A protein has these predicted regions:
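Metal-dependent phosphoesterase/phosphodiesterase active-site architecture
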Residues: 1-69, 140-221, 283-433
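Catalytic cores of eukaryotic secretory-pathway lumenal/extracellular enzymes that build
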Residues: 73-76, 88-91, 95, 172-174, ...
Length: 433
C-alpha cells in the first residue's frame, strides 16, 4: 500500500477537537463527522477510505509476512489545510498535529496487523518543513523515530536509530531478502533543504554512500536484496506532459548528480538486487533500469490509496520465493467509487493478477522486458495496460490530464522502457518505439 496521503482535515470542523485529543481518540472523532463516505476523485484519503482499505487488506491477506509502505503518509498541502481549519495554527501547534497524524496512522496499521512487521519509507510530503523539504537530522526524523522503530519491530537492524535520524534510511532482513530503504526524496530534482543550513552535508550523496555500504555488505553475505523507496528513477512524465513542448520540456525525477551514480551502483550490484519497489506517481506501473544497450533491473510501482489524481484507490499483494524472487502480484481496487461516494457501500475487488492478465510466468526482468515489448507492439495489450495504469479509473485520462491525455499513454509507455533522458526523448518525441 502506497501514497496513503491521509487527510485528517477532510472535515475541517473536526480539526480543533483532533488537535486537543490523543491519537487513540481520533477514530471516535472521525466517526462523529456527517461525511462517512470515502474520498472522492480529486481528494486525498479520508478516514472512511483509510478504514475501508485497512479492513479489506486484512480480509484479503490476514497474515502477511510483512507490510511495505513506499511513502507519502501525509496529505498534499497539509500546512495550508491545517492553517485554514485550526484555531491555533502556530508552528508548534502544526508540528504537534503532524506528529499526532503519524502516530494515528501507525496505531491503525498496528491494530490491523498486530503480529506483522510494517516497513515504511518516507515520501516527499512527509515532513514538517513542506513538500520535498525534509530536514536531514531534523525534528521530523527525531519525532518519527520511535513511531517507525515500533512498526519495524524486531527486524530493526543495528544502527537503525542512527540511520533513521540522519536521513530516514534503514535496512532489515526478512525471510528471504535483505530489504534496503534509501530515501530517494533527497535525489529529487525538487528537493530543497528549506529548514536546514547551507553548511549541512549533502543528504543525497550521503544516502548514496550509505546505500553502497549496504549493498556491499549484502553481497559479502550472499544475500539477495529488495530496494524500497518512494520516488522512482527516470522521467517525471506528469510534469513533462503538462509542459507540453518536446523535447526541451522533458523533466527528470532525480538530479543527474544522484541519478548517474545510482544507475552505476545498481548495475554493479545487479546480481545482488532482485527488485526495487517504488510509489510516488500514484499509478500501477513499472520501470526497466538500463537503456538501449540492455536492461539490468526493474522497479514495480505500487498504485496509490489516495484518489487525488483520479485513479481508483488501490493496494497490492505480492508473493515471493525463498530467494526473494517475485512470483506474482495482485492489485485490488475500490471499484465503483462514484457510486460509493453517493451512498452505496464501497466495493473492493481484485482488479487483476499479473501472471493471469499478461500470461507471463512471473515478475522478473525477462517478463517485464517482454511486457514492455507487448505494450509497444500489440494494440490489445497496450489498451489493457492503459486501463490498468490508473487502476481501471473511468475518469483519470480525461479529468486529470485534459488535452495532455492525448499524449499521456505514449508518455507513460516511453517512461517504462526508457530511463535515460536522451532515449526517452527519442521515444516520446519520435512517437514511440
Amino acid at each position: 500500500m502506497s501514497d496513503l496521503h491521509f487527510d485528517p482535515m477532510a472535515d475541517p470542523k473536526l480539526v480543533d477537537r483532533l488537535s486537543s485529543a490523543e491519537p487513540k481518540e481520533w477514530p471516535d472523532i472521525f466517526e462523529s463527522s456527517d461525511n462517512k463516505t470515502p474520498a472522492r476523485y480529486g481528494a486525498d484519503s479520508n478516514w472512511a477510505l483509510l478504514r475501508s482499505a485497512l479492513w479489506q487488506t486484512k480480509q484479503t491477506l490476514p497474515n502477511p509476512a510483512f507490510l511495505v509502505l513506499p511513502g507519502d503518509f501525509l496529505a498534499h498541502n497539509f500546512r495550508r489545510q491545517f492553517d485554514a481549519a485550526a484555531a491555533n495554527h502556530s508552528d508548534a501547534a502544526y508540528r504537534q498535529f503532524v506528529h499526532k497524524t503519524m502516530q494515528f496512522l501507525a496505531l491503525q496499521l498496528e491494530r490491523t496487523f498486530p503480529d506483522t512487521a510494517i516497513l515504511p519509507a518516507l515520501g516527499n510530503d512527509d515532513s514538517y518543513c513542506g513538500n520535498y523539504q525534509l530536514q536531514p537530522q531534523g525534528p521530523f526524523l527525531a519525532d518519527t523515530l520511535p513511531i517507525f522503530r515500533a512498526l519495524v519491530g524486531a527486524l530493526a537492524s543495528l544502527g537503525f536509530d542512527r540511520n533513521w535520524m540522519s536521513y530516514g534510511n534503514y535496512s532489515v532482513t526478512v525471510r528471504g531478502p535483505r530489504m534496503i530503504f534509501p530515501n530517494t526524496v533527497f535525489f529529487s530534482a525538487n528537493y530543497h533543504n528549506g529548514c536546514g543550513s547551507a553548511a549541512d552535508a549533502d543528504p543525497g550523496s550521503a544516502t548514496l554512500a550509505w546505500l553502497e555500504t549496504e549493498l556491499a555488505a549484502a553481497e559479502r553475505a550472499q544475500q539477495r536484496v529488495w530496494l524500497v523507496y518512494h520516488i522512482p528513477p527516470g522521467v517525471d512524465l506528469f510534469t513533462t506532459l503538462l509542459r507540453g513542448s518536446c523535447p526541451d520540456a522533458i523533466v527528470p525525477m532525480w538530479k543527474q548528480t544522484y541519478a548517474e551514480p545510482f544507475y552505476a551502483l545498481t548495475r554493479r550490484y545487479s546480481d545482488t538486487i532482485v527488485a526495487s519497489f517504488a510509489g510516488h506517481i500514484h499509478m500501477d506501473d513499472f520501470r526497466l533500469l538500463g537503456g538501449d544497450n540492455g536492461y539490468y533491473g526493474f522497479v514495480p510501482i505500487t498504485p496509490a490509496l489516495s484518489p487525488i489524481y483520479g485513479q481508483n484507490p488501490a493496494f497490492r499483494t505480492v508473493t515471493s520465493d525463498a530467494a526473494g524472487g517475485i512470483l506474482d502480484q495482485t492489485t485490488y481496487e475500490l471499484a465503483y467509487l462514484r457510486e460509493a461516494v453517493d451512498g452505496a457501500p464501497p466495493t473492493w475487488q481484485a482488479e487483476y493478477t499479473f501472471t493471469q492478465a499478461w500470461q507471463l510466468p512471473r515478475i522478473d526482468l525477462a517478463s517485464l522486458t517482454q511486457l514492455y515489448a507487448m505494450i509497444t507492439d500489440a494494440p490489445s495489450d497496450r489498451d489493457r495496460w492503459h486501463t490498468f495504469l490508473p487502476v481501471s479509473s473511468p475518469v483519470y485520462w480525461s479529468t486529470n490530464l485534459g488535452e495532455a491525455a492525448l499524449r499521456g499513454a505514449l508518455a507513460y509507455r516511453c517512461a517504462d522502457g526508457h530511463m535515460l533522458l536522451p532515449e526517452y526523448g527519442r521515444c516520446y518525441c519520435g512517437g514511440g518505439g
